[in-house]
């Protein structure tokens, strides 16, 4: 069973789309799940299944810790049911306007280094 990369992006965001396209190159190593963050957090979105308290906590955590990320990536281990935050910002080159803005070697390294169960995320 492969680990899962969960990509939280925004609709109509070219950087999010380019990151998603680049990460697709890792699909032989990971299952990849793309999540539209706005739809996810809508009142009737998928986050509503968490219940009001957990949903509110999740929204608060996103706002507090991930608001400076255009796109967020987590890795998920389906066997242990643990998640880890992946610091994608280290792999991005914003001078590029296509999927080459993601340095896949750096991203792979960040995915491997991401520690399960660490929250809030430790960023350098």
Swiss-Prot record:
Localization, UniProt: Host cytoplasm
InterPro entries for the chain: Glutaredoxin-like, Thioredoxin-like_sf
Expression triggers: Expressed in the intermediate phase of the viral replicative cycle.
Record-annotated disulphide pairs: 13-16
One GO location term (cellular component): host cell cytoplasm
Keyword Lyase: no
Keyword field: Disulfide bond, Electron transport, Host cytoplasm, Redox-active center, Transport
Main location: host cell
Self-association state and partner proteins as the record states: Homodimer.
Function (record text): Glutaredoxin necessary for virion morphogenesis and virus replication. Functions as a thiol-disulfide transfer protein between membrane-associated OPG128 and substrates OPG095 or OPG053. The complete pathway for formation of disulfide bonds in intracellular virion membrane proteins sequentially involves oxidation of OPG072, OPG128 and OPG088. Exhibit thioltransferase and dehydroascorbate reductase activities in vitro.
Family of this protein: Belongs to the glutaredoxin family.
Protein name: Glutaredoxin-2
Biological source species: Vaccinia virus (strain Ankara) (VACV)
Gene it is expressed from: OPG088
């Amino acid at each position: 069973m492969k680990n899962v990369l969960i990509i939280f992006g925004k609709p109509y965001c070219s950087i999010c789309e380019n990151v998603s396209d680049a990460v697709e190159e890792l699909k032989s190593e990971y299952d990849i799940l793309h999540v539209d963050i706005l739809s996810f957090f809508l009142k009737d979105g998928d986050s509503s299944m968490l219940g009001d308290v957990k949903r509110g906590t999740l929204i608060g955590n996103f706002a507090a810790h991930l608001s400076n990320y255009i796109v967020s990536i987590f890795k998920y281990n389906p066997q242990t049911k643990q998640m880890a935050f992946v610091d994608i910002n280290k792999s991005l080159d914003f001078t590029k306007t296509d999927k080459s803005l993601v340095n896949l070697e750096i991203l792979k390294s960040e995915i491997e280094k991401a520690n399960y169960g660490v929250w809030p995320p430790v960023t350098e």
